[in-house]
Amino acid sequence: MGKRPDYATVVYCNLIRHTYKKTPIIIGGIEASLRRLAHYDYWSNKVKRSILLDSGADLISYGMGEHSIIEIADALNAGIDVHDITFIDGTVFKTKNRDLIYDAIELPDYDEIKENKRSFAQSFYKQYCNTDPFSGKRLFEPYGGTTFVVQNPPAKPLTQTEMDEVYALPYMRNYHPSYEKD
């Protein structure tokens, strides 16, 4: 029915990574934002790990990414390696170096989350309590003690002027033309 593969972000990122091995891959949008940490997947009826690990992407820009994507682009343009971009609010990164994680709330390990509903609920509660852009804290989710997925605090919201600029862009304000009947 649809034209996208299931788990489109994972499929497309892995194809990009296979072809362009060292190209930075930054993902965003609804699929990446909702799957940035361990999450329940209705299609497979399982708790799945962060999309960052399954996709092979380097960073997630979650939520409203207008600020974070510009900061990421500026950092890359300044010559900062994508693996060193660990400081931008509204992003998620992965690391094997526990020392890179500071001032953060530890979530239950993925193996514990996928086996224990209470641990999953506790993890979700900590995530929920840290969604406010003014008081949200950095979170990290261990994967077997060797890999860590780190969610930086949420990005600050757009100002009224910035919001007006976004909505003044020439959007079609209509559904995509591919849905037109032939």
Spans of features found by a protein language model:
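N-terminal [4Fe-4S]-dependent radical SAM core
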Residues: 124-182
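Glycine-rich beta-alpha loop elements in corrinoid/cobalamin-binding modules
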Residues: 1-144, 151
